[in-house]
Design a protein with these regions (language model features):
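Fold-independent oxyanion-binding glycine-rich loops
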Residues: 1-2, 20-22, 38, 77-78
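Short N-terminal helix-initiation segments at or just after the protein's N-terminus
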Residues: 14-24
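Catalytic-core regions of hydrolytic enzymes
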Residues: 1-16
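Helix-loop-strand module that forms the ligand-binding subsite of alpha/beta enzymes
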Residues: 22-72
Length: 142
């Protein structure tokens, strides 16, 4: 999920914010990937089916009335089930995962954010395991 009102200071402090998310768009099929600008989200092109989606749109609307709001975009992918709470990636999303990462990296580049592939790359299963089982051990978990 997102930070709710905790998202507001990030939108006001930074020049660029790229939100990586899931989307509950019933008009799309599982694995569809979209990139929407903050303006598109504010104009209600962002779906507001879940609390997560409502929070993003509302924080963008509120921050757009302030002195500063980051140039915002959201890269989202449509999961099979957006309501259930669990950590994992379904086979349908695994098939699209590399494309999803590529779209995210492309969006970062469009925003002037350079990324460099790490020499050692964790596998998706290891990332999910560390997310599901956070640790305070240095370099492990979040």
């Amino acid at each position: 999920g997102t930070l709710g009102f905790g998202l507001m200071p990030l939108l006001q402090e930074y020049e660029v914010v790229v939100i990586v998310n899931t989307s509950s768009d019933d008009g799309k099929i599982v694995g569809d990937i979209d990139v929407l600008s903050g303006d598109e989200l504010i104009a209600n092109q962002g779906i507001k089916k879940t609390a997560n989606e409502v929070e993003i749109t509302e924080m963008l609307q509120i921050c757009s009335m302030a002195n500063h709001c980051a140039q915002t975009s959201m890269v989202s992918i449509v999961p099979e089930d957006i309501i259930s709470v669990h950590v994992g990636v379904t086979p349908a999303l695994r098939e699209k995962w590399t494309e999803y990462i590529d779209v995210i990296v492309d969006e970062l580049a469009k925003c002037g954010i350079n990324s460099t592939r790490k020499e050692f790359v964790m596998g998706l299963d290891e990332i999910l395991d560390q997310f599901a089982n956070p640790s305070i051990e240095h370099g492990k978990g979040f």
